[in-house]
């Protein structure tokens, strides 16, 4: 019976994902490959300081993107849950990228990560994270689970807080979409010769969302006391409507 309930809950989530907007977020998905032209568009973005990575979204296509998020709660806990994903299918050049998500307060409730196959039928990763889960931004390395993304395929991924394992329809879920693409030729040489501090801006200008988030987050991990880096990430997230994530 628990298996049937779990399958029904997952089916409901996927059905929502394939529909129209949820919680005010649009759901665009698979898009054209990023081009070298995106690298030239950064100069057009004048509203952000030069030190803040400016994200240039790729052209958008079929449905897909961020769902859920916002402040949710149970009788035991109230928290904000969000994936660090755009409101469209975000790009990465990595075969085994990292996925980032945020929870505003610690929780002792079970937290599960699911990555669905491109058809949205079977999970290629389904795991429960160690409890308790601390407040803040969390990183999931797909390499830790031997999960690889195929080029040109869009995957949907979810983080779920499970208040009642017997009633999975009560899960509090946030999700995003990710697609692996080839790195533009003009970007390869720039990345190879650039200092790590320049990588967030280079990836952002090329429309590579997940690589941008990973690059700025890795700088934060290397210098956790540098508040300017955290402010840069906060400003980057705000560009895709992710506010309230200040950690």
Predicted regions located by residue number:
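N-terminal signal peptide c-region/cleavage motif recognized by signal peptidases
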Residues: 21-22
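N-proximal, low-complexity, solvent-exposed accessory regions that precede a main structured/catalytic
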Residues: 25-80
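Extended, polar beta-sheet/loop recognition surfaces of beta-rich domains
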Residues: 39-44, 48-61, 85, 89, ...
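Contiguous beta-strand segments within globular domains
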Residues: 86-105
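Extracytoplasmic/surface-exposed domains of secreted proteins
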Residues: 99-101, 137-165, 169-172, 176-177
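Solvent-exposed serine/threonine-rich low-complexity stretches and specific carbohydrate-binding patches
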Residues: 123-134
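Preference for solvent-exposed, low-hydrophobicity sequence contexts
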Residues: 219, 224, 230-247
């Amino acid at each position: 019976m628990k298996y049937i309930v779990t399958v029904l809950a997952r089916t409901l989530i996927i059905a929502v994902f394939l529909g129209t907007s949820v919680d005010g977020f649009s759901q665009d998905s698979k898009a054209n490959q990023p081009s070298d032209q995106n690298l030239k568009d950064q100069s057009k973005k004048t509203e952000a300081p030069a030190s803040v990575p400016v994200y240039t979204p790729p052209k958008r296509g079929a449905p897909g993107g961020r769902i859920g998020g916002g402040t949710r709660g149970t009788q035991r806990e109230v928290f904000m849950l969000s994936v660090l994903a755009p409101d469209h299918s975000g790009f990465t050049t990595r075969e085994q990228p990292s996925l980032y998500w945020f929870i505003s307060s610690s929780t002792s409730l079970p937290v599960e990560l699911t990555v669905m196959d491109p058809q949205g039928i079977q999970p290629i990763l389904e795991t429960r994270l160690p409890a308790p889960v601390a407040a803040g931004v969390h990183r999931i390395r797909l390499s830790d689970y031997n999960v690889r993304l195929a080029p040109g395929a869009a995957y949907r991924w979810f983080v779920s807080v499970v208040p009642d394992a017997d009633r999975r329809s009560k899960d509090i879920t946030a999700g995003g979409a990710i697609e692996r693409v080839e790195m533009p030729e003009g970007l390869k040489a720039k990345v190879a010769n650039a200092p790590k501090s320049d990588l967030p801006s280079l990836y952002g200008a090329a429309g590579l969302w997940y690589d941008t988030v990973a690059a700025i987050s890795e700088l934060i991990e290397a210098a956790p006391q540098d508040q300017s880096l955290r402010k840069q990430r906060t400003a980057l997230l705000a560009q895709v409507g992710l506010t309230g994530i200040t950690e």
